Structures are given as structure tokens and as C-alpha cells.
Amino acid sequence: MAEITASLVKELRERTAAGMMECKKALVEANGDIELAIENMRKSGAIKAAKKAGNVAADGVIKTKIDGNYAVILEVNCQTDFVAKDGGFQAFADKVLDAAVAGKITDVDVLKAQFEEERVALVAKIGENINIRRVSALEGEVLGNYQHGARIGVLVAAKGADEELVKHLAMHVAASKPEFVKPEDVSAEVVDKEYQVQLEIAMQSGKPKEIAEKMVEGRMKKFTGEVSLTGQPFVMDPAKSVGQLLKEHNADVTNFIRFEVGEGIEKVETDFAAEVAAMSKQS
């Protein structure tokens, strides 16, 4: 049984856009042969499904704002990148953000109700659907934010840090996408799910269960580090972890929030040729 390395899984993910679990499973079934894994995934429809899931409504804006020890992050969606850059749409998103900060509103339904009339008027003017999708907030001793264009926004709350450090941490979160602050914060459900996957891979390599379990223990430590902020290599100095960086500054991150436009939304794509053909039949 060939060893299923992290680099092999990464390459398959990059080539197919499929999820990590799906790629691991395909590589195990193909005995580590990446070309065979791709062929099998094409036959099973896994690649097609992954591409469909990746067709998110990736249009709109992420907005962030800090007011003293309180910060808000907001996502407002539209249907095209053209409208996302429209002045009227941008002004609407800014107005919603200001209201969320001023009123400390974290319930998106409250924001939707407050701005429904303006939203409807803007939809009529622009000709695209507009949605106030989500809003969240952080409070903390020191707050930092970072925006990668209008598509990615991050808030970070920390203790004992200066503004520059928190800004750099926010940039790291934008780039590295941690899911938790510290390895010990990784939920038992996530750990157990990954453990079972790794154990199955180790067992299928022909190792005795006792040896396989020891192998998996080491892999799990690596896994919890990879998905947590403090366990990741710092993007501006990969020789040290974010945890080491914080220790050097006698600082601590209490929480962070990362929003990316359209994540989790499936975008409906129009087949232009099919649409024209359908219209010609009707005429």
C-alpha cells in the first residue's frame, strides 16, 4: 500500500477542487496513483460535484469597522462583480455597516428588516438581487482588521498586543484560513472525524492496529496545529509559529472572525447557448 502523503492529497485537491476527505478516499482506493484517482473521481461524478459546489455566488463585499473596543464584520451580496463595484451598492453596504456598529446589531434579521425598503429600491434601480447575508462582531482589549480587496475581511481581538501586531495577525488569518485560535480549541467532533480518516488510511497500509494508532496520534498533533491560528507558521516569517510570535510579544489572541464573499453559497450558472436555443423554440 502506497503512503498517502499530505502533498499528494494537496495536489489532488488543487487538480480537482474536491474536498480533502474525498481526495484522501480516492487516493487510498487508487493505492496512491493520482492519475487513477482522478479517473475514478471523474467516473463517480466526484469532480463534477466539487466543481458545482465551487460555483459560489462570489460577488458582493465584505466590510469591517472598528469603533474603540468594538468591531463589526459584514457581508452584503449581489449577483455580479460589476454591481459589487457600483457606487450605490457600496454606499448601501457602508450604511448597513455603520448601523450595525452604532446599534451593536449582530442579528442579521434585524438589519434586514431595518434596511428592507432601501434594499428593494436599490434592487429596482440596479436590476440585481441584493442580500444582507451575515454580520458578526468582536469585543476586545486590542482589535485589528484587514481587508483583502473587498472579498476577504478579518477581525482579530487580542491582549497585550500593539496595533501593528494585530494587523499582521489579521493578514495571516486572511491568508492561512485557521479555523480555531489554539490546537486545544479544536472541537472533539472535528478531531474524532479526522482521527477515523487517518486510522483507516493507516490500517489500509497493512500496519497492525497498535502501530497504526501510534502513527495516527502523531498525525493528529500535526492536524490540530494546521487548523489552529497559534499552530500555523506565521506567513511573514514561516520559521516561527504564530504561537511563538505571540509569546515573543507577551500577547494573546482571544478570538478572530474571517469572512470571504460567497463562501458556502452555490451560484446558479446560466448556459447561454441553451438559453438562446430555448428562446428560439418559443418564438
Swiss-Prot record:
CDD domains: UBA_EF-Ts (cd14275)
Disulfide bridge positions per record: none
InterPro entries: EF-Ts_dimer_sf (IPR036402), Transl_elong_EFTs/EF1B (IPR001816), Transl_elong_EFTs/EF1B_dimer (IPR014039), Transl_elong_Ts_CS (IPR018101), UBA-like_sf (IPR009060)
Recorded coiled-coil stretches: none
Region (Involved in Mg(2+) ion dislocation from EF-Tu): 80-83
Alphabetical keyword list: Cytoplasm, Elongation factor, Protein biosynthesis
GO molecular function, one term: translation elongation factor activity
A Pfam family that the UniProt record links to this protein: EF_TS
GO terms under cellular component: cytoplasm
Localization in the cell: Cytoplasm
PANTHER family: ELONGATION FACTOR TS, ELONGATION FACTOR TS, MITOCHONDRIAL
Annotated function: Associates with the EF-Tu.GDP complex and induces the exchange of GDP to GTP. It remains bound to the aminoacyl-tRNA.EF-Tu.GTP complex up to the GTP hydrolysis stage on the ribosome.
Similarity annotation: Belongs to the EF-Ts family.
NCBIfam families: tsf
Protein's name in the database: Elongation factor Ts
